[in-house]
Amino acid sequence: MNLQIIILAAGQGKRMYSDTPKVLHHLAGKPLLTHVVETAQQLNPNAIHVIYGHGGEQIKSSLPNLPVHWVHQAEQLGTGHAVLQAMPHIPDDAYVLVLSADVPLIQVETLQSLIECSQRQNPDHSVLALLVAELENPSGLGRIIRNNQGEIYSIVEEKDANEQVKNIKEIYSGVCCTLANNLKKWLPQLSNSNAQGEYYLTEIISLAVQNKTPITSLTAKNSFEVQGINNRQQLQQLERIWQQRAANQLMEKGATLADANRFDLRGELYCGKDVYIDINCIFTGKVVLGNGCKIGPNCSLTNVTLGDGCEVYANSVLEGCHIANDCHIGPFARLRSGTQLASHCKIGNFVETKKAIFDEGTKASHLSYLGDVLLGKNVNVGAGTITCNYDGVNKHQTIIEDGVFIGSDTQLIAPVTVGANATIGAGSTIRRNVPPDELTLTESRQKTIYGWKRPVKRERD
């Protein structure tokens, strides 16, 4: 089967009150359009055509790697006119599935069923299949009109509906599937004689009836699948639905969430057994949590892998890190891109790392900056230690070998190497390589000035 998918993404989105095109607004960390394209990809189509118009160049430049064929709708003359723009690129014998970029939560299983409906009833594949839904509040949506036999013969848009039609609960989702040849016959016949002065795609239903093309419908199992986004309130509502579904899926697979309503996933999260996630945690990109991991409250993890038995304490921020088994991080720690921890490492409160590679058992427990540094096994980094890695132009590396003990308030001026089992005295500024197994310090004599008095403030006249 040749399957061609058309995604309508040309709308202006006036009710968003934004300079950003509506389809670029994010839900669960991704643009709305990306959600729909990723769902479409799971159907293995021959092509995905995205119809763009308002803010089109911004859309294309923001999503340059989408595997789609971009089709420009120069004038936004309605949904029917938008679909018509793609038809020259689609062979007559292909099936065409029409989706909307602002309906992001539609499920691939639903679309597969709709495609099957479009093939089921007639051997010449001329059926028009519509995705419909029953909504308690159908306001703003096109209503399905059926005859006495229950057959669909029309769809009436909200702005063209009388009070009787507005009372109908069954709505058209904007999603349909039929043979391309049907659309090529019907679309040029559309009229813009309606309240909006637009060429509605929904008018193809009346044309299908006139041509005696069978119309079938599939009712969406979940109302959220057909919910569109026209304003920021609706965006927030679907965000919470998406997050709740993601939370439920994680809990079904064995993770514990302290509060599913205070959990945010903005990418992919893979959890081992007996993972615990406290409140207000944000997971972005691809995050992997090994067996028995615990994530404290108010943490942010972006593109992070944690091994088994790791614990991240409250208010810690991790980005682009790979953490091995049984490590402890935080509270209030910041691990930046390029940080790698071997097993049994500890990063304590108010420690920042960047491009820092820790071997087994190494600890930095308090108040340190460790950037562009290689640390061996069982190193102890004292409070207030800083690797001074930037000379104003270039970054330089610090190497700290196995078993080193670094006293508090030490500055390591890179490039510099500290030999194995060396000890650095507290308050030292290390500018040259340190030999192994020795104590190195930069001594400044302590001096007492006897009889010195503090200045006394004088009262002003």
UniProtKB/Swiss-Prot annotation:
SUPFAM superfamilies: Nucleotide-diphospho-sugar transferases, Trimeric LpxA-like enzymes. The keyword Transferase applies. Residues 233-253 are annotated as: Linker. Pathway: Nucleotide-sugar biosynthesis; UDP-N-acetyl-alpha-D-glucosamine biosynthesis; N-acetyl-alpha-D-glucosamine 1-phosphate from alpha-D-glucosamine 6-phosphate (route II): step 2/2; Nucleotide-sugar biosynthesis; UDP-N-acetyl-alpha-D-glucosamine biosynthesis; UDP-N-acetyl-alpha-D-glucosamine from N-acetyl-alpha-D-glucosamine 1-phosphate: step 1/1; Bacterial outer membrane biogenesis; LPS lipid A biosynthesis. GO terms for biological process: cell morphogenesis; cell wall organization; lipid A biosynthetic process; peptidoglycan biosynthetic process; regulation of cell shape; UDP-N-acetylglucosamine biosynthetic process. Keywords: Acyltransferase, Cell shape, Cell wall biogenesis/degradation, Cytoplasm, Magnesium, Metal-binding, Multifunctional enzyme, Nucleotidyltransferase, Peptidoglycan synthesis, Repeat, Transferase. UDP-N-acetyl-alpha-D-glucosamine binds at residues 8-11, 22, 73, 78-79, 142, 157, 230, 336, 354, 369, 380. Its EC number is 2.7.7.23, 2.3.1.157. Acetyl-CoA binds at residues 383, 389-390, 408, 426. Its cofactor is Mg(2+). It is found in: Cytoplasm. One of its GO terms (cellular component) is membrane. It holds the Pfam family NTP_transf_3. Binds 1 Mg(2+) ion per subunit. It catalyses: alpha-D-glucosamine 1-phosphate + acetyl-CoA = N-acetyl-alpha-D-glucosamine 1-phosphate + CoA + H(+); N-acetyl-alpha-D-glucosamine 1-phosphate + UTP + H(+) = UDP-N-acetyl-alpha-D-glucosamine + diphosphate. The active site is at 366 (proton acceptor). Signal peptide: none annotated. Mg(2+) binds at residues 102, 230. GO terms for molecular function: glucosamine-1-phosphate N-acetyltransferase activity; magnesium ion binding; UDP-N-acetylglucosamine diphosphorylase activity. In the N-terminal section; belongs to the N-acetylglucosamine-1-phosphate uridyltransferase family. In the C-terminal section; belongs to the transferase hexapeptide repeat family. This is Bifunctional protein GlmU. It comes from Legionella pneumophila subsp. pneumophila (strain Philadelphia 1 / ATCC 33152 / DSM 7513).
